[in-house]
Amino acid sequence: LKILPTITVFCWLICLQCYAFGQRYPLSRDTVPHKNNGLFRKIGEYRDSMRHKDYRQAFMKRITRQDVREPSNDNDSTIIKSEAYFTPFAGKVIRNIYYRKVKVFGPSNINDTAFTTSMQLVHLANRLHYDSREWVIRQSLFFREDQRLDPFEFADNERYLRNRPFIQDARIYVMNADATSDSLDIEVVTKDLYEYGAELSQFSEKDVRANVSNNDLFGAGQGLKVGMQWRSDFTPTWNTEARYTKYNVAGSFIDVSAGYTTLNNYMPLDTNVYEGTYFISLNRPLYRNSAKLVGGFTLANSWSINIRGAQPQEEDSLYRDYRYTVVDGWIGYNFINNYKHDGTIGHKPNFAILARHYNLSFQRKPGQTRFKDDPVYNNHRYYMLELQAYRIDYFKAHYFFGFGRTEDIPLGFNISATTGWESWKYRRRLYSGMEAQKFWLTKRQGLFNTTVGVSTFWLNNATEDAVMHARLEYYSRLVSFKKARFRQFLTIDYLNSPDPFFFKPLNINMDAGILGFRNTRLNGYQRLNMGSETVYYSPFKLLGFKFNFFTSLQASMITAKNDDLLRNPVYLGVGGGFRVRNENLALNTIKVSGYYYPNAPYPVKKLMLEITTIVDFRFDVSALRSPSFLSFK
């Protein structure tokens, strides 16, 4: 199939060569010459050309600047409303939709149409990549020809395309929008991620772990991932995984994934266990704000693997022999929507109702006596019902978590009230909870994200496993100095359970507290985490890989020694390093860092150097998600 474009390009080159030959060697003397074009003849030709619609529209477009592209703000700190570009064209009829693909290894800015390169390696890499097929992009559009332009719909569509796993960036442009006409043309521009990916997460003489993936197989909006691990002290020594994903099945906006793994990387039930899993999942997110139905379904069957070769029948054995099935489904209905077709949004919130059913059932439980009363190894079922009010607008910006790519930021509020019923270890409890989240901009273009939540379970008119959670995040304005850019990040997170029953105590290890803390025995039911990070977005680039340098300060307190949180020591971590990523590639970010812990608890050392990979973090732009209990981890 790849040879057909090559033949086409070859034919075009022959035609261009013939044209160039004709220009260089004009007609010979014995050929009948053309008549000279006088002034009156040129005026007549100009009059005739103005009668042609195509030429007339092109002429008017040049003098009225109708096809001016959305201004690029890649190097600016401005946060721009997503629908602002489309609002002046609200209500106009869509005549034609055109599609344009920007090469993966092309311009870093999708608006750049003048990019050229003579590097043969770049051309080879682009030829090896299957561009997303036009029908895949067309299936992902919310609009069609002969419909009227809705600014919110177009902004949602652009954001949906940009958040597809196989697309790096996307833009929707208005074309031929004559001020005197009620119709216009649309151009959809997309830039793919390079489809091939690979990761070597572990490599030593006794342990090798790697995977390869393709996030847009044959350009058909589908992904495939295959992984393996060989470890000499495991039984069996070889373990594998495979996952297939089809995005937006038949234009339904449902993503379907299916696969298996014996690498213990699909939500293991407990710590110090090793599991294998078969699974299938379907997910239909709130892909646009006017979507009525959202939901998802997961079916998984997991089992323990005796990876260390322990004796399962021994009472003191670390191996737990079990097998269980999870059935998890949720659905939501967006029944009040206040986004207007003219590109404006009122002060009234939108309303949605959501429901969820979760059932974890064991086919085989561990034989050890000490696990019989552990709630983790008992059947667990719950039903949830949630009412949600939200008013969210979306903005576009750069240089938050990325290396220059367009990032979508939700601004507004989300309030949810949840109730439910749970059956776990022969206890049937009612649940109630409330959670509120708000994003807002400061006058200096800083961004706040606040979250507050309270919840509890009810049994015999008494509360248990109550949770109180508060979180504050601050992102400063992007500060630019020549080609350098800086941004400051601040976080404060407080979590407490005053009456735990099933809950296990908190810790401050890794993401739960301080990066670099592992296997500490600091546990409690109240925790306060604080963090500060300064990021320098370097202009330095090597073979497409960009560098972000950072310094960080982490602080954590936990009620491990005293029930009064403020009477416990403050554990600190000071560090810095850099992150490296090529945003054209479907690879995780490489992080190189070093940390110093002045009062490190046992068994943490005072100094740590680390090279690891981290996943690409993005703002959660979906207003509606699966109902869940307030997390206590």
Protein language model features and the residues they cover:
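Amphipathic hydrophobic-ligand
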Residues: 467-468
